[in-house]
Each structure stands twice: as structure tokens, then as C-alpha cells.
């Protein structure tokens, strides 16, 4: 078993583009006033993969599904997907990452790496 990283550091300009496409602060941080953990290098979006095949393991939803099926409740998904998501959560927490309750794929580590308040100006 291994990991596939979808997203880590994200420039503010990319955050602004995401916000423009999906302006919901529960799932996408505002590029100026939000927490912007990806812009600060304190967040990672990832999943589990089978190292032999390279295939992604079954998870509660696809990546960036912005609805309640993506949360960490897991009662509304396939039991295998729930078990895989719990494995990912357990491993990430073991290494100091905190899960975000609304997205099974999103983890932060703001304790080990203090947040840098300097940002590039948003584009557009």
C-alpha cells in the first residue's frame, strides 16, 4: 500500500481560480480571507494506492467531491471504502497530520510547520 498525492502547496493564484469555480468556504478556502492551508504549504490532499498495480484503493468518493459523502462519517459509503479511509486517517495522524472533517483526503500539519503569513497577491 502506498499514497498518491493530488495536491500540496498551491499558489494563491491557483486558490483564486478554485474559489472562482467553487465559492463554498466549507470546501474551498477564500484566496484572501480564508485559512489557505494549501497556500501556506501546510496541507496535503492524498489517497491510498496498491503499490503493485498503481490503482487507487476504493474510497468514500472521488477526489474533490464537495458534498456530505466526502466527510469522515463514513456511514453512507461502502464498508471497504470506509476501512480504507480510516487506514489513511490513522497513518496520517500517526505522523502528525490532522484530518479535515469535511474531506476524507485533506490533512494539515500546522503544528510542525508554523504558518507563514506572507502571500503573493491574488491574480485577477
Model-derived features: positions:
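Cell-envelope/glycan interface and biosynthesis
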Residues: 1-124
Amino acid at each position: 500500500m502506498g499514497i498518491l498525492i493530488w495536491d500540496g502547496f498551491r499558489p494563491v493564484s491557483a486558490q483564486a481560480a478554485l474559489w472562482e469555480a467553487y465559492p463554498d468556504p466549507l470546501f474551498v478556502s477564500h484566496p484572501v480571507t480564508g485559512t489557505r492551508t494549501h497556500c501556506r504549504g501546510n496541507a496535503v490532499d492524498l489517497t491510498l494506492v496498491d503499490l503493485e498495480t498503481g490503482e487507487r484503493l476504493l474510497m468514500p468518493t472521488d477526489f474533490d467531491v464537495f458534498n456530505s459523502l466526502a466527510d469522515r462519517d463514513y456511514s453512507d459509503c461502502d464498508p471497504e471504502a470506509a476501512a480504507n479511509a480510516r487506514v489513511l486517517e490513522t497513518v496520517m495522524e500517526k505522523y502528525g497530520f490532522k484530518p479535515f472533517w469535511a474531506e476524507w483526503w485533506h490533512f494539515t500539519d500546522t503544528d510542525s510547520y508554523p504558518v507563514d503569513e506572507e502571500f503573493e497577491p491574488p491574480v485577477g
